[in-house]
């Protein structure tokens, strides 16, 4: 019999996905170990919609800003302002937001360790083990796990070691700079507005952003083109926003998955969540809500495994996610592939967003995380407007 410490669930990665899974399982009375590396902050605009605030009980004090509108900037510098009617998009600083989520999990009973994951192994009785290096002691430890949740981000080591096909995942790369909000504001500055730049020199296949974070701002961009300089593009973006002289607080970069992995479990005791599972929305790059939802679904699947012993239940995490959000991801993927492919198309895309029907349906879907079906005539109108832009018949 092994003398290694045993947990019901070991969760690798303490971002929104892993911390949410740890919290949910600990509240159910499960013995949970949450492993996370200290000092790792992911580049992220920090936007969380009302659905995330409601579903995951996010307190107001974590919101460093409340965005009341979005501005879309075309290649010609044409601007389209879109008000967020009757609500707001919460903005968080990931450094503090993620730590709060981890602390909430610990308060519910999860055990936290500052550690670097090394590998999944097998004990002498066949139970899985997790081997990690302690961040404080630099000592190697082994624990036993009845179930494992891999929430260790894009290029997940857990996924690549345990889930078939995970190594084939394709990625885009994101980079941003957190800067101090200047005391003397640029003439067009608005601390309650998210600015989105659809311009090829800032990204050949994505967009650049300037998002308010209260006393700071997130300024960044992303691309799948490995030869494209994200740092140079961000420098240009800062100049365009009048923030080239703002003090830089920190710089962060990381890969992001391009689409959900075809499989999230190993058919035995491992299930993936968050970026490790590929749940970053195409076109928008949104990941916080989907990561937290993925963490919750992974926790549900792990709980069912612990109760029933039936490993087939692990596949339910992906099935449930794709049932509710797969169509949205597919639509966003098509949209990004087409509209972000040239400045001519970007110009038409921004022009199309002047339409009030497009604005309302887009924000209704974003805020509530579901395709809006209540107004079929509006969908028909948008279809014909879309076709006019696709065929070049609409005025820009």
Predicted region positions:
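Glycine-rich FAD pyrophosphate-binding loop
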Residues: 10, 23-44
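C-terminal helical "tail/cap" subdomain of flavin- and related membrane-associated enzymes
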Residues: 303-396
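A conserved beta-strand/loop capping segment in the N-terminal third of enzymes
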Residues: 51-102, 114
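Predominantly flavin-linked oxidoreductase catalytic cores and closely associated redox partners
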Residues: 104-246
